[in-house]
């Protein structure tokens, strides 16, 4: 840092005032954020999208809803047969699924989801054969969500090397050597 006499600042802040305004990490150690340790004053100036995206596409939501409906169906079938249900092992649920026998069960299987039934009570499924829960609203409706083009998964791939014919390569080398 270049030291200047106080008189040369003429209207500008003194060096002591400038040093007080500079950021010192020792002063902000108690106010660090949980994520990567940035001070809060830096995060307040710029609030970008989070590093992870909490957006779930409708196709993925439908797949998970169908999976949960199948799991609930398996639990109901296991209770009906008198077998104990092991909720801790998800792989056992995936391996032992049965086809629905009634059309109403098929309809319910596609419409029920984890958000609709927070507990594993199977008695709520068969309260009414026409029971169709409303689809859950996406969390992104509340805040400005990503557009369909903004958050696409892009897999990195090494670009293909361009192969020039040997004659063109030699001609380009000769042009560069003549200059």
From Swiss-Prot:
Bias category Low complexity: which stretches?
1-15
Reading the lineage from the top rank, the first entry is: Eukaryota
Q: Which InterPro entries match?
A: CDRT4
The annotated region (Disordered) lies at 1-20
One Pfam family in the UniProt entry = CDRT4
Q: What is the name of this protein?
A: CMT1A duplicated region transcript 4 protein homolog
Q: Which organism is it from?
A: Mus musculus
């Amino acid at each position: 840092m270049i030291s200047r006499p106080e008189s040369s600042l003429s209207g500008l802040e003194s060096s002591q005032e400038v040093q007080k305004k500079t950021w010192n990490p020792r002063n902000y150690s108690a106010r660090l954020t949980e994520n990567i340790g940035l001070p809060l004053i830096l995060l307040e100036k710029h609030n970008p999208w989070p590093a992870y995206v909490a957006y779930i596409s409708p196709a993925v939501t439908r797949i998970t809803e169908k999976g949960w409906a199948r799991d609930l169906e398996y639990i109901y079938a296991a209770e009906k047969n008198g077998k104990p249900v092991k909720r801790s092992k998800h792989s056992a649920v995936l391996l032992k699924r049965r086809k629905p026998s009634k059309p109403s069960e098929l309809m319910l299987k596609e419409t029920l989801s984890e958000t609709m039934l927070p507990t594993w009570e199977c008695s709520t499924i068969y309260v009414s054969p026409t029971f169709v829960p409303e689809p859950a609203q996406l969390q992104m409706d509340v805040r400005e969500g990503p557009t369909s083009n903004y958050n696409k998964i892009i897999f990195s791939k090494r670009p293909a090397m361009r192969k020039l014919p040997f004659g063109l390569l030699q001609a380009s080398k000769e042009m560069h050597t003549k200059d």
